[in-house]
């Protein structure tokens, strides 16, 4: 998969199969209170009868799709991917005929996608609810002026553990590694994404996970392939519910997916969530419209609809990620949503987050990921 993407993009642009990574986002506290913004989605024009998504799995409340159809008419179809690379490869291979209207890339991929003609330039006048976003989540470094993207949500990477499998508390990435090699050996999952997998080594050692230093990449490969991979049962980008169903004892996970696992179990006290230290990941996912979409009015209508504060709050309850809408934290607290410490992070936690990058090391990380899969014990 990675090779097809690398070959498809001109100019030697390297894209990894990273699940989520970005390079600018707001801090841990919202700095806003109470405001609710616009509450009615304004139609961008007569909508078509269909809207096609290429999307991360289980990433929006199914009831919201039905609500959109009931209110505006377009039926929705969703195909899913597990990594940015998989999504980009399919768009490139389709040569503008994918049939998709909306895709949801992570921030750092947007400049290359836009430069290679995969994304529409947005007319923000057709998205009046854009004003509901906090300014911390607009005008990101990888898309100044929101020319091609609008924040969907943002989050980080940690783990979820079954405490009947690993009784010792896991506080750091080194604790995670020790548990993976010890009581959870053969019963762990890691994210099915090269940069998140290799990130474990860099984060545990307090290193820059966007490094291009050959010696550091060699050390990462030795650890990932020889030390960690033999203990891995599965490469799974959505392990939260699977773990609480007994499929894993320890899983690397994005915060919202881990929260979905806790919400799905009758005994959440059996499990523990943790954010890695000394460092871990920061990412932002974004609504974008595919170049020459078959249903452009419906695509604009959807983005405007999902930025409605009421709709955004409903979606947050489902997926467990901060949507960046003004007042959403206060609204979630008022609604007594569960496990909000997994959604809204403290400033101290955010201080440990580091953004990813697309650079010359990405292909090497893909190679390490492939070698790790071959060496995995599962």
Predicted regions and their residues:
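Short beta-strand->loop
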Residues: 120-131, 149, 268-281, 290-293
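A structural signal for short loop-to-beta-strand junctions that line the ligand-binding cleft
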Residues: 98-105, 120-161, 186-188
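Ligand-binding pocket segment of bilobal, Venus flytrap-like solute-binding proteins
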Residues: 189-193, 197, 201, 208-276
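Bacterial lipoprotein signal-peptidase II cleavage site
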Residues: 18-29
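Conserved C-terminal helix/tail region of periplasmic/extracytoplasmic solute-binding proteins
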Residues: 241, 346-378
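N-terminal export signals
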Residues: 1-19
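Mature extracytoplasmic/periplasmic domains
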Residues: 285, 290-350
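Early extracytoplasmic/lumenal segment of secretory-pathway proteins
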Residues: 37-112
């Amino acid at each position: 998969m990675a090779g097809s993407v690398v070959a498809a993009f001109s100019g030697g642009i390297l894209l990894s199969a990273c699940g989520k990574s970005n390079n600018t986002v707001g801090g841990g506290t919202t700095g806003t209170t109470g405001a609710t913004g616009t509450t009615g989605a304004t139609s961008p024009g007569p909508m078509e009868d269909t809207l096609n998504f290429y999307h991360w799995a289980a990433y929006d409340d199914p009831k919201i799709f039905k609500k959109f159809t009931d209110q505006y008419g377009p039926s929705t179809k969703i195909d899913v991917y597990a990594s940015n690379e998989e999504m980009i490869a399919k768009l490139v291979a389709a040569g503008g005929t994918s049939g998709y209207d909306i895709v949801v890339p992570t921030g750092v991929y947007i400049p290359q996608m836009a430069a290679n003609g995969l994304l529409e330039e947005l007319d923000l006048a057709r998205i009046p609810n854009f004003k509901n976003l906090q300014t911390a989540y607009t005008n990101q470094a990888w898309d100044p002026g929101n020319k091609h993207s609008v924040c969907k949500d943002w989050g980080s990477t940690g783990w979820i553990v079954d405490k009947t499998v690993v009784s010792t508390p896991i506080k750091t990435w080194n604790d995670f590694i020790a548990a993976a090699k010890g009581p959870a050996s053969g019963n762990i999952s890691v994210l099915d994404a090269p940069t998140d997998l290799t990130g474990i080594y860099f984060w545990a050692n307090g290193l820059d996970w966007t490094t291009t230093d050959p010696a550091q990449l060699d050390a990462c490969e030795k650890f990932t392939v020889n030390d960690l991979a033999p203990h891995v049962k599965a490469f799974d980008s959505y392990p939260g519910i699977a773990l609480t169903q007994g499929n894993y004892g320890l899983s690397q996970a994005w915060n919202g997916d881990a929260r979905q696992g806790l919400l799905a179990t009758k005994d959440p006290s059996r499990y523990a969530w943790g954010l890695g230290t000394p460092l871990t990941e920061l990412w932002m996912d974004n609504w974008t419209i595919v170049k020459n979409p078959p249903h452009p009015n419906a695509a604009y209508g959807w983005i405007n609809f999902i930025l409605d504060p009421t709709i955004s709050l409903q979606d947050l309850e489902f997926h467990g990620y901060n949507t960046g809408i003004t007042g959403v934290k206060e609204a979630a607290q008022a609604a007594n949503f569960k496990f909000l410490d997994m959604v809204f992070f403290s400033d101290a936690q955010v201080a440990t987050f580091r953004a990813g990058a697309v650079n010359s090391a990405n292909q090497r990380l893909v190679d390490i990921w492939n070698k790790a899969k071959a060496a995995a014990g599962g």
